[in-house]
Amino acid sequence: MIEPGIVLRDSVTKTEAEDAGRVLVTGSHGGLYAANLAARARFRAAIFNDAGIGKARAGIAGLAYLEGLGMAAATVGFESARIGDAGDAWARGTISHVNGLAADLGCAPGQDCAEAARHLRAARMPESEPPALEETAHLIASEPGAPRVWALDSASLVGPEHVGQIVLVGSHGAVLGGRPEAALKIDALAAVYNDAGIGIDEAGVSRLPALDARGIAAATVAAASARIGDGLSTYRDGVLSRVNATAAA
C-alpha cells in the first residue's frame, strides 16, 4: 500500500486477494473491461487512466458502469500521467473525469490523483455483483499454412497458444510500469494495440520499440478510431497510428 487503504497496480489484471476493500489506483484504461475486473476484485473505489477518451468515449466508459454497481470511480488524464504506470498516476496524475459517487465524496476534475484517492477511502463498498464477462477472445482468421489472427480484449489474455500468431489487442500500447520486458508475454508474429491517445511521454506507444528489440512486428491503432478494451473494434474499426521498424520493414 502506498498509504493506508490505497494500493497502486500498473494493471487491474494484476491484483492481489488482499486488495479487496481498498482504493485502487491503476495504470489501466477506464473502459468497460478494466472496470469489470476492478468490480470483480472487490475494490472499494478506483482511479484509472482516461486513455485519451477515444472512440465512443470508451476510455472512460467504465465510470458510468461502475456507478451502476455502486462503485465510486475516476480517471486521470492521459496527458498528465503515463498509462500503464500507477506510480506515475499517483505522482503526477490529474483527475479528468469522475462519476457521481466519486463527486459526492469530493472528487473533481483538476485534483491531484493522490488527493482524490484519499477522498475515495470514504466510499461505501459496492453491494452489486458485476455480471460475468462476455467472450473476450475471438479467432478472426485460421487458414492452413498461415498464422492465425486473434482479437483479444486484453493483453492479459495472450497465452502460449498465440506464439507465432497475430494478436489484435484492445489494450493500450504502453509497457507496464515502464518495464520493456513486460511488453508481451510470448513471442507473437505481430501485435496491434490501442495507442490510448499516445499521451505524456508517448507512453501509449511504448510497447513498439520494446517489441522491435525482440523482432516482433507491432503497431497501434488510434484511440479515436477504435474502442479501447475491445479487440474486435481494434480489428474492425482501427486505423493505424504508429508502427515499429519491424512492422515497417
Where are these predicted regions, by residue range?
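Residues that scaffold, gate, or flank divalent-cation-dependent active/transport sites
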Residues: 1-249
